[in-house]
A protein has these predicted regions:
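Extreme N-terminal starter segment of soluble prokaryotic enzymes
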Residues: 3-10
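CN hydrolase (nitrilase-like) catalytic-core segments centered on the catalytic cysteine
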Residues: 64-84, 150-249
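Active-site catalytic loop in hydrolytic enzyme cores
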Residues: 64, 90-172, 176-193, 245, ...
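Cys-nucleophile CN-hydrolase/nitrilase-fold catalytic domain and related Cys-dependent amidase chemistry
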Residues: 20, 24-111, 174-205
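Short polar catalytic/cofactor-binding loops
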Residues: 12-17
Length: 281
């Protein structure tokens, strides 16, 4: 039986470029805090080991399973919590921007490789080629990463929803210009619009957690990550993280996972009833 009311820890983690030991230690502390506060799942950022587009990805990326993922698995087991987070994955001669979902026994139950990789990041990461979902005590969970949720790549979210996802977890590294201040809206409709479309059409919850800190090295050097992570359902924003440039923090989201009866071709009929006709796009 699935648990409909789920407590998600949104771990806005301070991530330093090329410093996996320090970053993973912070992830450990975040897992400990999330467990203490009663979270069922802890969601961590994209590329939490090395930072997104950091040049160290070429030489320091590790396989999955491997030393970095093993540490996250141990944290999940030690603190009896599900953990989803992004890692830089080495596989043969390729590097991927990957994410894993780990159960509370420390087992990897889903691995995903980012598909909608920005052009500037393609010198570091190869393109992923598959999507999957997994059944958990908290409903069916799908995983994607950051720009997979751009409005022009929403097919990725649609596919996860059609595969049954009731909850989409999206490790992210949302970057903004260094000059942006706390008084400004960092993202506008960039993320809220696609999240609202998906959650409204499928009655699912989508949650993205971004890192905080300044990017050092790579094509985005000098930009910063400022938090403001979001959890969104069909009614709008459930909770939003605080603006933060230098210090990580844990945000708690209480969500309701809604059963969905429509499957297969019935989903198309459901979407049509809601005024969404994919053939008109």
């Amino acid at each position: 039986m699935n648990k409909n009311n789920v407590t998600i820890g949104m771990g806005q983690l301070l991530v330093e470029g090329g410093e996996p030991d320090r970053n993973l230690q912070r992830a450990c502390e975040m897992a400990k805090e999330a467990s203490r506060k009663g979270c069922d799942i802890l969601l961590l950022p994209e590329c939490l080991d090395l930072t997104w587009t950091h040049p160290s990805a070429r030489m320091e990326a590790q396989p999955i399973p491997g030393p970095f993922s093993d540490k996250l698995c141990q944290f999940a087991k030690d603190y009896n919590i599900y953990i989803c987070g992004g890692l830089t994955e080495k596989c043969n001669d390729k590097v991927y921007n990957a994410a894993i979902l780990i159960n509370n026994y420390g087992e990897i139950i889903l691995k995903y490789r980012k598909i909608n990789v920005l052009v500037c990041a393609q010198e570091f990461y190869s393109i992923g080629n598959s999507l999957s979902v997994v059944n958990t005590p908290f409903g069916i969970i799908g995983v994607n990463i950051c720009s997979d949720n751009y409005i022009d790549s929403l097919e990725i979210g649609h596919t996860l929803a059609r595969m049954g996802a009731q909850l989409i977890l999206s490790p992210s590294s949302w970057t903004v210009d260094y000059s942006l201040t706390e008084t400004e809206d960092p993202y506008g409709e960039k993320w809220l619009k696609p999240y609202s479309i998906l959650s409204g059409l499928y009655d699912l919850v989508i949650i993205s957690v971004t890192s905080v800190g300044y990017i050092v090295g790579g094509p985005y050097e000098g930009k910063k990550m400022v938090g403001c992570s979001m959890a969104v359902d069909k009614n709008g924003v459930i909770v939003k993280g605080v603006y933060n440039e230098l210090t990580g923090n844990l945000v708690i989201a209480e969500i309701n996972v809604v059963p969905r009866d429509a499957k297969g071709t019935d989903i198309g009929k459901m979407l049509n009833r809601k005024g969404y006709y994919s053939h008109e796009i």
